[in-house]
């Protein structure tokens, strides 16, 4: 597939970064639709056909995957109203959109980030994942040391505890994974890479390599949700909420959502 992004995509995002203003954007929204949002929707449609071949558990649908350009500034010191990148995430079909691990793509004025994982999971999710890692660390190790994973994204990384998590011994064979508070794997490129003929093939290669990690991370969260769905009482016809939201995020240096 030829990349749907073009030099006009990057030119628009760079101009938006210099003019992060609602009035400026309103006057140029047709160009945004043509050169930024439209190409991403085209990409998501193609991924909707290709993703099920290796990640049938994940969603690629513009109604779910595409992030809005407008920022929520209510609790932020940064009052810039608009995001200066275009991004999409590919969450689990078995979890709410804002929960769990997924794949992620971002095209920004100076960079492209392709990868996935779990950026800022709530502590309840971290505990579930740690228990899953402790019981299945060999499976995780096989994923993140596999040839396709290492060649595509290098290593599993993220913020981690300086010591041993509560409830685990210091000589646990999976300690390096148990200390993680984030679970991230991805690769960064120059922004212009998004416009090349190699872009889509590389996107698929990285997504294919990271998808087993996403599936591993989501397994305990899906099981937990199924378990509480069976036991939680109904209130006004709806299940009581069980967890705070978590969502896929790129490394801190990669984006400001």
Question: Where are the language model's segments positioned?
Answer:
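Aromatic- and glycine-enriched beta-alpha-beta binding-site module
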Residues: 74-134
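Soluble extramembrane domains of integral membrane proteins
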Residues: 56, 60-96, 100, 142-160
């Amino acid at each position: 597939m030829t990349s749907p992004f073009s030099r006009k995509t990057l030119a628009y995002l760079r101009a938006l970064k210099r003019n992060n203003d609602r009035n400026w954007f309103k006057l140029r929204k047709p160009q945004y639709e043509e050169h930024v949002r439209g190409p991403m929707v085209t990409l998501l449609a193609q991924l909707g056909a290709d993703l099920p071949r290796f990640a049938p558990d994940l969603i690629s649908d513009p109604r779910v995957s595409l992030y809005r350009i407008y920022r929520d500034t209510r609790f932020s010191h940064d009052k810039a109203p608009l995001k200066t990148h275009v991004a999409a995430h590919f969450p689990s079909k078995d979890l709410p959109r804002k929960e769990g691990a997924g794949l992620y793509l971002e095209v920004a004025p100076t960079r492209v980030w392709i990868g996935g994982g779990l950026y800022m999971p709530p502590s309840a999710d971290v505990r579930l994942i740690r228990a899953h890692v402790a019981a299945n660390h060999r499976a995780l190790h096989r994923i993140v040391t596999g040839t396709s994973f290492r060649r595509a994204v290098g290593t599993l990384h993220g913020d981690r505890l300086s010591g041993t998590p509560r409830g685990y011994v210091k000589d646990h064979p999976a300690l390096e994974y148990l200390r993680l508070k984030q679970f991230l794997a991805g690769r960064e490129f120059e922004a212009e890479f998004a416009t090349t003929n190699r872009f889509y093939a590389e996107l698929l290669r990285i997504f294919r390599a990271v998808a087993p990690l996403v599936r591993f991370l989501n397994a305990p969260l899906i099981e937990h949700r199924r378990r509480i769905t069976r036991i939680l009482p109904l209130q006004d016809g709806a299940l009581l909420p069980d967890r705070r939201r978590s969502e896929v995020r790129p490394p801190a240096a990669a984006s400001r959502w």
